[in-house]
């Protein structure tokens, strides 16, 4: 509530638990454990599907999807980029973890850096591409909160609610354009792979990535 700048949470959120033999479950990709219909205040969850990245427990999944509804309410229904919405939902659902650091570091090592403006389709393609998108979106929001403090999120959402575009709101609150912020973000994370040698063993490479991520 405080993170999003909401004084009133609004109407109760309906949580639908859909069994695997339901039509709604059959129509959703098998790797999706839940989704939100934010404008209607509804979350649809598939309890028979073991939550996987970015959520490792059912409780985290619930918080993640409810987070989408709350972000929608914080902006008064005005749109924010998918990556920001997903990054916030991840931030609301659980703390940042070693696995998240490792995934972002792997994106740097493997040359899979994706511009935030190009991240949208990655959430829909495959489980692997969605996990990649969640990690990058979560990392950027985590970085924003670390640099600007948690009140920055509420200020950005409040400005969007008041009629500002998301880029203008972000600039007004942080003093940086999204392009500048993204460039700085990647610059701060580049050191994580500068000392990784070229190795033939992928297992060894992952061990190095994990060790470096511990110090992030």
Explain the meaning of each model-derived region.
Residues 45-57, 73-79, 89-90, 124-130, ...:
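Second-shell loop/turn segments in exported
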Residues 21-27, 96-101, 163-168:
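Secretory-pathway/luminal and periplasmic proteins that interact with or process carbohydrate-rich
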Residues 52-61, 79, 83, 128-135, ...:
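Soluble non-cytosolic domains of exported or imported proteins
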Residues 113-117, 125-132, 158-216:
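Beta/coil-rich, acidic/histidine-enriched accessory regions frequently appended to metallopeptidases
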Residues 60-73, 86-90, 141, 149:
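Active-site recognition of the HExxH zinc-binding catalytic motif
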Residues 1-80, 133:
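Juxtacatalytic substrate-recognition/specificity segment
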Residues 101-144, 148, 153-156:
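Long, well-structured alpha-helical subdomains associated
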Residues 2, 6, 77-121, 172-189:
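Post-HExxH zinc-binding segment in Zn-dependent metallohydrolases
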């Amino acid at each position: 509530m405080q993170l999003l700048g909401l004084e009133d949470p609004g109407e109760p959120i309906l949580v639908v638990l859909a069994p695997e033999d339901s039509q709604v479950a059959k129509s959703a990709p098998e790797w999706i454990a839940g989704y939100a219909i934010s404008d209607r205040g509804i979350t649809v969850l598939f309890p028979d599907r073991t939550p996987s990245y970015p959520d490792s427990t059912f409780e985290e999944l619930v918080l993640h999807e409810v987070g989408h509804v709350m972000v929608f309410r914080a902006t008064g229904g005005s749109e924010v980029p998918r990556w920001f919405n997903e990054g916030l939902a991840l931030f609301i659902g659980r703390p940042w973890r070693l696995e998240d650091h490792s995934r972002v570091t792997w994106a740097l090592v493997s040359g899979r850096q994706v511009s935030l403006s190009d991240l949208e389709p990655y959430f829909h393609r495959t489980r692997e591409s969605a996990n990649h998108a969640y990690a990058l979106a979560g990392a950027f929001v985590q970085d924003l909160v670390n640099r600007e403090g948690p009140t920055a999120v509420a200020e950005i959402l409040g400005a969007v609610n008041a009629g500002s575009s998301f880029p203008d709101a972000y600039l007004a609150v942080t003093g940086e354009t999204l392009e500048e912020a993204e460039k700085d973000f990647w610059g701060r994370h580049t050191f994580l792979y500068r000392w990784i040698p070229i190795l033939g063993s992928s297992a060894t490479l992952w061990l190095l990535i994990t060790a470096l991520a511990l110090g992030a």
